[in-house]
Design a protein with these regions (language model features):
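Metabolite-binding pocket within alpha/beta catalytic cores that recognizes anionic/polar moieties
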Residues: 1-106
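Structural motif
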Residues: 22-26, 56-59, 74-77, 128, ...
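Short, small-residue-enriched loops and turns at beta-alpha junctions
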Residues: 33-35, 67, 136-143, 187
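General structural feature for long, well-ordered alpha-helical segments within catalytic domains
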Residues: 39-42, 46, 59, 63, ...
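Short gly/pro/ser/thr-enriched loop/turn and capping motifs at secondary-structure boundaries
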Residues: 66-68, 84-86, 167-170, 186-188
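Metal-dependent peptidase/peptidase-like ectodomains
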Residues: 97-134
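Active-site/ligand-binding-proximal alpha/beta "capping" segment
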Residues: 120-158
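A C-terminal functional module that forms or caps the active site or interfaces directly
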Residues: 142-183, 187
Length: 189
């Protein structure tokens, strides 16, 4: 299903199915046939379309390069943090004169509950996973220079990829739409 959004068209149609009896939706961020480079993906439309179709969690699958010596090609990594080195990408739903200034809590960019579920499922399936990694999100589509990789390592990054941002921030913004942030004034105590 192709869903129109206020932010333009998503990268492609959303495919619906089931895994182990649970409903899932799949959206190819680079388009079918891998035709959209990372800096041209309409991340806002993609995340909005998934949200409008009722997604309650997003598992983002991406190809990354390993910076950390103990991470080998083929290893499964579930990052816990992200550093954004991208620029010029539409990275918020809260912009324009009709929107108020909104700040999302991005201290933990990835949903803790969903990470635990993924780690538990991987363990149950006997899949070894690195559960502590910092993802460096770069602009693409070119690969990074050796000097850039050295910088990312000094900054604390463990893996490098091109699609982690603004995807994670946009998903967090929409997750906050239906979630209470704190007790209301007059209700604390």
């Amino acid at each position: 299903e192709v869903l129109r959004t206020p932010y333009g068209e998503p990268s492609g149609a959303i495919t619906f199915g089931q895994i182990c009896g649970r409903p899932v939706a799949f959206l190819a961020r680079h388009g079918y046939g891998h035709t959209i480079p990372p800096h041209e993906v309409n991340y806002r439309a993609n995340i909005w379309a998934l949200w409008k179709r009722g997604a309650v969690g997003i598992i983002s699958v991406a190809s990354v390069g390993s910076i950390r010596a103990d991470l080998r090609p083929g290893d499964v990594v579930i990052p816990h943090q992200i550093i954004d080195y991208t620029w010029g990408r539409k990275s918020t739903y809260h912009e324009g004169q009709q929107c108020s200034v909104t700040h999302i809590d991005f201290t933990e960019p990835y949903d803790r509950k969903l990470r635990v579920q993924l780690l538990t499922a991987a363990s149950s399936a006997g899949i070894a996973v690195s559960n502590s990694a910092v993802y460096a999100a770069t602009q693409g589509p070119r690969l990074e220079t050796a000097a850039e990789i050295n910088r990312f390592e000094r900054d604390g990054a463990d893996v490098v990829g091109m699609t982690g941002m603004p995807e994670a921030a946009l998903a967090r913004e929409l997750a906050g739409v239906t979630r209470a942030h704190e007790r209301a004034d007059g209700r604390r105590g």
